[in-house]
Amino acid sequence: MGDLILDPYMEDAILDHSCLAELLADQTALPLFHPYSGGATPQMVDTDTFLRAIGALPPLAPPPAAPLAPAPPDSPRTPHTYGSLLPVYGDLPPLSGAVLQEPLPLPEGSDHPVSPKKTIEVASLLQERADQPVVTSNSATTTRPQLCAPYDDDIEATLRAMETNPVERPSPYFLETTQGGRMTALLRLVAATTVFLAAKYEDQYTLRKIDASMVAARCGYTSETRHKMVSCMETEILAALDYNLGGPTAYTFVEHFTRYYGKGKEEKLMREAAHWFADGSLLTYGFHRYLPSMVAASAIFLARLHVRGHEPWRKDLAELTGFWYSDVSTYGPTADTFVEHFTRYKCTTAGERKSYGCMQRLERDVADQSLMNYVRLPGATIPAVHGGGGRRASISVARCSLNRHDALVWSTELQELTGYSFEDLVSCIFAM
């Protein structure tokens, strides 16, 4: 009997054997040695499973697959879980079961609804969105397109708040009241260390170019510990400033106000000239009484006047800078101080000579305008000009431009970008 069962080629003999029914009815487990049992403990196998494994009986048909249960409403695989947290792209509604599927009526002879695949016409969506306007600011006076709408207003507000922070503002006449005009070696060390700190803050490779010992030696310190003196002064300055070194300057606001400029030749010249005016204002202590944004807007005014040759302030510029004409006429710096300041420096490099040539042309333009019959600005306090004084730049750039109402350079875009109108910048331009 055992030989008949173990021989797979004697299937007919097994099927005809009279003891097959008795064998199948017998549920006694047969011993089967497992490969890893070591022959010690037999593995017990069901008789029916054993016969089907050796091919004596046909294999069983696989059981029908059970239908999958529907996912609960709070399953993480369904849109119901996320609700309003799902992203909404453009004008499309948020994803939901009703949007994704639209069940049809039950067909005849069927127990389950048929859900067709939802199709979206992409061409119609693109055509609808093509006529939508460019995203702009929430401000009612803002008309310019914004490069990065979610952050543009935040950057503007942060810069404006930082420049008006009393901690960030310099103390006027501080050296006169504390030093009385006396310069000491310690004060020179403070000045040199601040320049050293600023250079390291702006350029990480400064330590390879500037040595602290050389900085101390230029201040009159020749001892062996002069390097440590610079390090100690750095620590004291940083502690006094509470490590706040990133305040906005006129250079920062020139970059901010000209961020919409393209790569054209004229815009490039205006940007370079504005930076040149703003950088020069840092060398004059009197400009510290003006906000950096006002100095930057005045620099843009002078740059546009030099490049375009007519009135460089319009409504869009006032909205851009935040300064209007009335504000500048009362509180801003002028051009005569600025012209005299820049023309007294010696030019060594090609870039400086080019900038100096631009300044000379601006000076000649201003001198030519001195023969005009000046019109007093409305609401502005402008001293009368008597005599020649062309080289002194006794004519203000604002006066020269205000007598030419037919052309405007200070546009609404620049006014909106900087927040200054032409009226806001007049007095600041006068000081320049």
Swiss-Prot record:
GO terms for biological process: cell division; G1/S transition of mitotic cell cycle. It comes from Oryza sativa subsp. japonica. This is Putative cyclin-F1-4. One of its GO terms (cellular component) is cytoplasm. PANTHER family: CYCLINS. Keywords: Cell cycle, Cell division, Cyclin. GO terms for molecular function: cyclin-dependent protein serine/threonine kinase regulator activity. Belongs to the cyclin family. Cyclin F subfamily.
